[in-house]
Amino acid sequence: MSLPEHSPLGKPSAYKTEYDASLLFPIPRQPKRTEIGLPEGKPVPFFGVDIWNAYELSWLNLKGKPQVALATFIIPSDTPNIVESKSFKLYLNSFNQTRIASPEALQQLLHHDLSEATGGTVQVRLVTEADLGKQQMGELDGLLLDRLDIEVDRYEPAPELLFADQDETPVEETLVSHLLKSNCLVTGQPDWGSVQIRYVGAPINQEALLKYLISFRNHNEFHEQCVERIFMDVMRQCKPVKLAVYARYTRRGGLDINPFRTNFNTAWPDNKRNARQ
């Protein structure tokens, strides 16, 4: 099993400039799911995607001229593995001096390698120079929790803070906070994010939810793992009928990671970059 501490994170790395798919370092999802009460071999109560955006992708055409593009990778949450982010960066950098016939050929190669590493089918989208001006930005929709004037003293995940008023009429609500911060599981470096919680069910106490989200501030876990922990904690403590959790993290090493988990059929998020990304 590939363990996070064996990944390139936190270690000096040689930057290869010739294509090398072996640089990708997969990490199994299951150990962290077991940690949040989801045993191996049983269905998980959510589905979704991890949306990765790469801003530093370059290669050479067959004449040796550099090419650049943005790339989006959509990794289903039911793949057995995630990819450690520094290894992803090193892998993408390995294309820098690699001659490739066309963007379509690169897209096919990326699809193959990421699908092999994650154990599933990864969608790859490239945005070449001609279409860069068409890229849109947008903020997460919803009622902003950060408006609340609260006192905070918990900085490790505290699901017991969460509660909903089960005696009230069910509501359909979308809540947003930009105060999510967690830390890399291996290096402890800060990860900054915005999070959107959509649900149908008994009204979730908003002050409690904001305190809970802030409680991740000193927690060490990868982005995908944090979102799944949030999903499970809200489900168990507040018991909504429908729940979707979406986080957009700021980029590091030319990559941003945006996990989405839901228990009901809905369109995947539109992947608009927010101002902090």
Curated annotation (Swiss-Prot):
It catalyses: 7-aminomethyl-7-carbaguanine + 2 NADP(+) = 7-cyano-7-deazaguanine + 2 NADPH + 3 H(+). NADPH binds at residues 85-86, 252-253. It is an enzyme of class 1 (oxidoreductase). It is found in: Cytoplasm. The active site is at residues 184, 191. GO terms for biological process: queuosine biosynthetic process; tRNA modification. Its main location: cytoplasm. InterPro entries: GTP-CH-I_C/QueF, NADPH_dep_7-cyano-7-deazaG_red, QueF, QueF_N, QueF_type2. Substrate binds at residues 83-85, 223-224. The keyword Oxidoreductase applies. One of its GO terms (molecular function) is preQ1 synthase activity. Pfam families: QueF, QueF_N. Homodimer. PANTHER family: NADPH-DEPENDENT 7-CYANO-7-DEAZAGUANINE REDUCTASE. HAMAP family: QueF_type2. Belongs to the GTP cyclohydrolase I family. QueF type 2 subfamily. NCBIfam families: QueF. This is NADPH-dependent 7-cyano-7-deazaguanine reductase. It comes from Cupriavidus taiwanensis (strain DSM 17343 / BCRC 17206 / CCUG 44338 / CIP 107171 / LMG 19424 / R1).
